[in-house]
Regions:
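Residue-level signal for pocket-adjacent positions within structured domains
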Residues: 7, 30, 37, 76-78
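Acidic, metal-coordinating catalytic segment for phosphate/diphosphate chemistry
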Residues: 1-15
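Charged phosphate-binding loop/patch that engages nucleotide di/tri-phosphates or the phosphate backbone
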Residues: 127-149
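Unchanged
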Residues: 43-134
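Short histidine-centered beta-strand/loop micro-motifs
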Residues: 6-7, 27, 40, 107-110
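Glycine-rich active-site/cofactor-binding loop and its immediate structural neighborhood
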Residues: 24-54
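Anionic group-transfer/hydrolysis microenvironments
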Residues: 17, 30-31, 96, 122
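A cytosolic small-molecule/anion-sensing beta-strand core signal
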Residues: 20-21
């Protein structure tokens, strides 16, 4: 099944682009050493957007909620799908949702990346992994903040 982490061909994950008045939350991936948005694999019975919200809450310690439009069935707008090759020959699909992180300082629990903070839009764009940078440029422009490149 595509949502199964052990599936051979396709891994699907859900992640949250966490934004607020302070900018964007980025964290340093513990294994890869790159700066990304919170996210992870989808648990059994979970939707990709449920996973994005749960992972955002777990990895940041923030009270989070969907920031983009949510339809009558409670399904939030899908902001971006990132497609890239995974480490073991599989295709990785990351479904990204816009999440409101409020204004508090991140407080990640033990076991999650401790390298996490709010970055203003320009700093986030500079620091983010290339796969995230493009959507941050678009979001920054549509939110009336950050650069217009």
């Amino acid at each position: 099944a595509p949502l199964d982490q052990e599936s051979d061909l396709t891994h699907v994950t859900g992640s949250g682009i966490v934004v607020g008045p302070r900018g964007v939350v980025l964290l340093e991936h513990k294994r890869l050493g790159i700066w990304l948005q919170p996210g992870g694999h989808i648990d059994p019975g979970e939707t990709p957007w449920d996973a994005a919200l749960r992972e955002s809450r777990e990895e940041t310690g923030l009270e989070v909620a969907f920031a983009g439009p949510v339809d009558g069935a409670g399904v939030p707008e899908l902001m971006h799908v990132d497609v890239h090759e995974g480490g073991r020959g599989h295709i990785h699909l990351d479904l990204r949702y816009l999440i409101d992180g409020g204004v508090d300082d991140p407080d990640p629990p033990e076991g999650e990346s401790q390298q996490i903070d709010w970055f203003d839009w320009d700093a986030a764009i500079d620091r983010a992994d290339p796969g995230l940078r493009g959507i941050l440029l678009v979001l920054g422009a549509t939110h009336g903040v950050g650069r217009r490149e």
